[in-house]
Amino acid sequence: MDDMPLRRGHFRVVAVASMGQLTGAALATLVGIILPMLQIVRNPSLSSLAQGLVGCTSLVGIMIGAMVFGAWSDRKGYLVFFRLCPLLVLAASLLVFFTADLPWLVTGLFLMGLGIGGEYSLDSDYISEIMPRRWKLMMVGVAKASSSLGNILVAAACFFLLREWHDPHTWNRLVLLISLLAVIMLLTRIRFAQSPGWLIAHGCPAEAERAVKYFLGPDVEIGEIVRRPAKKDRPKVGWRDLLRGGNGKKVIFTGIPWACEGLGVYGIGVFMPVLIMALGLESASETPFLRIIDSVKLTTYINFFILPGFILGLLLVNRWYHVRTQTWGFLLCAAGLAVLYAAYMLRLPVWIAVVGFMAFELFLNAGPHLMTFILPPQIYSVAERGAGAGLAAAFGKLGAVAGVLFIPLLLEWGGAGLVLLVTVGVHLLGALVTFVFGRAVLPRRRERPEPRRD
């Protein structure tokens, strides 16, 4: 299985395991559309702080879900949680639909975040265990890139639905889009097998062999994962251990840029419709609801550049030095936002501002959004890899939560211009940290295409 060509079973595993990434991005996009609708239907409207708190609720759930379900799945097996997570997302989304109230929206977003966080803790393992050696890095990247489909599909669907319904009170119906994705996720996993890597780690090589044959066919023999040590024989490495013996540079190199990227992906991503209206990029409309529809339409167009960004990044994965890709990605993101800022301040034509926004999304996803995901497994040893990647991801989610929490406050304090300036500064910081620490931590000769948790 390590050297075989790709076949249908490989693509099936990638498609099924990628649904969590797709649904997570879809939920983030949906929250950014629902929040301005709530501002219309609620009296009094939400404060800037309340908007930020509601917006980051699902991200907090993702952080907790990744830790909790990740730990439980290590003990109980991946498959049960691979099915439980979409059930949780489905139940929480239906709760929001039937209650249509702010407290239950917050509860539902948190529960949906828990389920999606569980997905994030499992998807890359399933993919990397099944893929041939030369395709591991690429296919884990493809799973990450699938999140772009969630951004695009939900934004487009919301635009067409809102244009038909023409009523801001229907915001809760939009959550059924997440219900639909959860149903698809669940149905694709009814007939599925346990993780071969988990079975090997728990001393079940015969069952692992059967799982591999289920996924790839009866003619396939199990590969290098059979040589993994049993879980009880592996050295224990905690986050404190990563700060000893000169490992601090690794933590800075993987953690700080991921946190900086989180502001762009989630802070700007979640509040894109709000930011578009604050920048005056939507067409002049008579009512606030029509302005929301116009902003969602432009959000859809901008989101279309997320997918080409990921594709560009995947094409560069095995060709460019990863530190260079991430550094230039941050710099070009900042340049795109600088164009957007100049267009806003100088009242330049709208198309110039939109080009800046699209450039930001293109290079964000070609560089930092993809690279921060695949760099941690390359710089940590097998014993440190799980803890190292987990700590880097925690930095990323903290950056995302901070971004979503503070974007509405920045809009209140200094308008869209302040949001853009802060975001440019954060991305320049990400470029600086990557450039300074990257060459020391990850020399060119040490790049290893094995993005997995062992």
Language-model region placement:
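Transmembrane-helix signature of 12-pass secondary carriers
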Residues: M1-D454
